[in-house]
Amino acid sequence: MQELSIAFGGREAVRNVSFEIAPGQSLGLVGESGSGKSATSLAVLRLLPAEASVSGRIRFTAPGATPVDLLALPERDMRRRRGSDMAMIFQEPMTALNPVMRVGSQIAEAVRAHQPGLDRKSVELLVLDAMHEVALPEPERRMRDYPHQFSGGQRQRILIAMAIVNRPRLLIADEPTTALDVTVQAQILALLKTLRQAHGLSMLFISHDLAVVAQACDQPGDQIAVMQQGHVVEQAATLDLFHTPKHPYTKKLLASAPTMATDRAQRLASV
């Protein structure tokens, strides 16, 4: 991504954001609500509202292919890449699924959109493989269930299955653990790590929670970028950012989170 800027109605929401995600690498994008994190991720998939004004370059390179600027692609080509070369796990697993469609049909819909030549049996096998891979119990039976019959953590696994079923190279996870309790949150983060390692996925992980981002971006080469008011104010390797933060905003973010060693009488830093 090179100097991405996004404006809505003449008001700039993202300004000159640049970063790179290498194959197999995870980049955490962290910042407070309204800092431009989600707008940046939606720009990658070109899912911003029609009134958004977008400039800059977003170069994507598939294995063995020539780099392409996603912002310059015709919409037809972008539709082909969206969901196959790159996919997104959206926020709010409790509401992101269609409540009147069986979950297996929703995953199958993603397969048919990008592999239209497959017969019904082949599609079903891919759906079952994806459900197995995200550790959903009894997928042969549960693929015929509706979203309301699953817990919040299981619904998040279904959304992840929909995202990975076509084997994308880039996975965008936008606050994938926000609505989950800490135990299920840890399970989802462990699952994402397993999928990264199994498929060599690159990942853009978005959160307002530095602790969650630290868990999602804990492999060698992983980095964290801190956003404030539409700018990336600091980007560094995960350990470097936590041990030696450079920007005042990053320091305040870290200081605002309590630790086991924090004195109960000590006031936390405000951001």
Task: Give the ranges of each region predicted by the language model.
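A short, proline-enriched helix->beta-strand linker immediately N-terminal to the Walker B motif
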Residues: 165-169
